[in-house]
């Protein structure tokens, strides 16, 4: 996972890299369709689902492009075939804490007409193309909850077009590291202790603000 430092004491972790994030190419699975009209039946078959049978998918390295001057790592005959792409990634409990307090962005450069899916749910789409530029879609909180511990998959479909075609996309989280949980050493009988902001221990059932120690982690409840 790539990390960059930002202004205002925040950092950005790239969950899925793009060429722009500095890691270059990215592994994926892809499938080329025959016609744009094949995308709709593929959607009805839920090609974007987390539990999709991937035995007939091809392994590839993105980005994909028909133009050697635009993101070309894997050749995509975009004037002939629409394409479906699946990118798997793994999240830890620590990653989910960052996601909960942070801003999660989908970043993408496309040509043409992409539709994005996260763990089987449609995220966003775009019309046409954006050349060498990148669009950004900020995941609302309800969509951030789609991200789970363990395996996740971010998918995209693109249509065949008369001109060029390409796709580069990734996922990042920007957060304040001072707000993430801090690992602590705790004894088995010390599974949960709750303190108020004055440092006084209170009932674990309280709804008051304070510092919560649970399962070896310290979390600030605001």
What do these predicted regions represent?
Residues 1-68, 88-90, 141-178:
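Accessory carbohydrate-binding/adhesion or oligomerization-edge regions at the termini
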Residues 117, 196, 213-214:
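A general beta-strand register signal
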Residues 3, 65, 75, 171-198:
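Residue-level detector of functionally pivotal "anchor" positions at catalytic/ligand-binding pockets or at interdomain
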Residues 120-121, 197-200:
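Short, glycine-anchored, charge-dense loop/turn motifs used at functional sites
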Residues 57, 81, 89, 95-118, ...:
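Aromatic-lined ligand-binding clefts that engage carbohydrates, nucleic acids, or primary amines
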Residues 68-84, 126-134:
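Extracellular beta-rich ligand/substrate-recognition surface
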Residues 209-222:
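C-terminal tail/sorting-segment detector
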């Amino acid at each position: 996972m790539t990390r960059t430092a930002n202004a205002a004491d925040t950092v950005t972790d790239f969950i899925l890299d793009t060429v722009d994030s500095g890691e270059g190419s990215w592994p994926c699975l892809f499938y080329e369709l025959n016609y744009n009209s094949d995308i709709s039946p593929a959607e009805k078959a839920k090609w974007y689902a987390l539990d999709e049978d991937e035995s007939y998918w091809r392994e590839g390295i993105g980005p994909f492009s028909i133009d050697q001057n635009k993101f070309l790592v894997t050749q995509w005959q975009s004037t002939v075939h629409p394409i479906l792409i699946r990118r798997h990634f793994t999240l830890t409990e620590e990653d989910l804490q960052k996601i909960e307090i942070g801003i999660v962005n989908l970043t993408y450069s496309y040509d043409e007409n992409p539709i994005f899916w996260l763990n089987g749910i449609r995220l966003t789409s775009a019309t046409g193309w954006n050349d060498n530029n990148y669009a950004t879609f900020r995941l609302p909180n309800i969509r951030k909850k789609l991200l789970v511990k363990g395996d996740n998959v971010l998918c995209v479909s693109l249509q065949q077009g008369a001109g060029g075609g390409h796709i580069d996309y990734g996922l990042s989280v920007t957060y304040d590291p001072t707000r993430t949980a801090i690992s602590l050493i705790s004894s088995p009988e010390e599974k949960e202790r709750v303190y108020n902001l004055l440092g006084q221990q209170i009932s674990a059932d309280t709804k008051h603000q304070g510092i919560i120690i649970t399962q070896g982690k310290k979390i600030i409840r605001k």
